[in-house]
Amino acid sequence: MSQPVVVIDAKDHLLGRLASTIAKQVLNGQKIVVVRAEALNISGEFFRNKLKYHDFLRKATAFNKTRGPFHFRAPSRILYKAIRGMVSHKTARGKAALERLKIFEGIPPPYDKKKRVVVPQALRVLRLKPGRKYTTLGKLSTSVGWKYEDVVAKLEDKRKVRSAEYYAKKRAFTKKVSSASAAASESDVAKQLASFGY
């Protein structure tokens, strides 16, 4: 990738496949920001994935529950934990790699104005057979105790309205510029200059 910061839109990506790609890149020194973590997908039906998460919730230190493992409910933390498991996070190299990673639900500023990319090898439509069942990470998180799905959805609706307004203005401006340049190229002065080789 080799850009200063790569912003990945996680919508409709498979959790594990995206995590492995990101883990490789952050270890190689690439700074990565992941947005819309709540729109990630996990293969398999919702009920099965919920049972798997409840199995994970039962894992705890027998004599002192505060010692871990810690069961994060937010989609951003679930993705972070998946990536952390693919990085040697207890070494200096692994810690430095994880510091190059940021994960968000929704698309907060300033990343709403940055160009976002997708990871083709992790996209659900390219990886899952059509008709196979899948689960949205936001839905799974909400079912196990994440409380902010409505808040993120509301903020995303506002962002989409702002984005549509900006795009409409940009399109109108581009149209004006193209029509003005077309008019200028058809003028008598332009024809005369063209005859002199300009």
From Swiss-Prot:
GO cellular component assignments: cytosol; cytosolic large ribosomal subunit; nucleolus; ribosome
GO MF, any single term: mRNA binding
Domain of life, per lineage: Eukaryota
Biological process terms in GO annotation: cytoplasmic translation; maturation of LSU-rRNA; negative regulation of translation
Keywords tagged on the record: Acetylation, Cytoplasm, Isopeptide bond, Phosphoprotein, Ribonucleoprotein, Ribosomal protein, Ubl conjugation
Residues bearing PTM N-acetylserine: S2
Matching InterPro entries: Ribosomal_uL13, Ribosomal_uL13_CS, Ribosomal_uL13_euk/arc, Ribosomal_uL13_sf
Localization annotation: Cytoplasm
Residues the record lists as Phosphoserine modifications: S43, S181, S185, S187
Pfam families listed in its UniProt record: Ribosomal_L13
Residues in the signal sequence: none
Record flagged with keyword RNA-binding: no
Post-translational modification as stated in the protein's UniProt record: N-terminally acetylated by acetyltransferase NatA.
The keyword Ribonucleoprotein is annotated on this UniProt entry: yes
Cross-link Glycyl lysine isopeptide (Lys-Gly) (interchain with G-Cter in ubiquitin) per UniProt, renumbered positions: K176
Listed PROSITE patterns: RIBOSOMAL_L13 (PS00783)
Transmembrane intervals: none
Reported function: Component of the ribosome, a large ribonucleoprotein complex responsible for the synthesis of proteins in the cell. The small ribosomal subunit (SSU) binds messenger RNAs (mRNAs) and translates the encoded message by selecting cognate aminoacyl-transfer RNA (tRNA) molecules. The large subunit (LSU) contains the ribosomal catalytic site termed the peptidyl transferase center (PTC), which catalyzes the formation of peptide bonds, thereby polymerizing the amino acids delivered by tRNAs into a polypeptide chain.
HAMAP family reported in the protein's UniProt record: Ribosomal_uL13 (MF_01366)
Subunit structure: Component of the large ribosomal subunit (LSU). Mature yeast ribosomes consist of a small (40S) and a large (60S) subunit. The 40S small subunit contains 1 molecule of ribosomal RNA (18S rRNA) and 33 different proteins (encoded by 57 genes). The large 60S subunit contains 3 rRNA molecules (25S, 5.8S and 5S rRNA) and 46 different proteins (encoded by 81 genes).
Note: There are 2 genes for uL13 in yeast.
NCBIfam families: L13_A_E
Similarity comment: family membership: Belongs to the universal ribosomal protein uL13 family.
Protein name as it appears in the record: Large ribosomal subunit protein uL13B
Organism the protein comes from: Saccharomyces cerevisiae (strain ATCC 204508 / S288c)
Lineage of source species: Eukaryota, Fungi, Dikarya, Ascomycota, Saccharomycotina
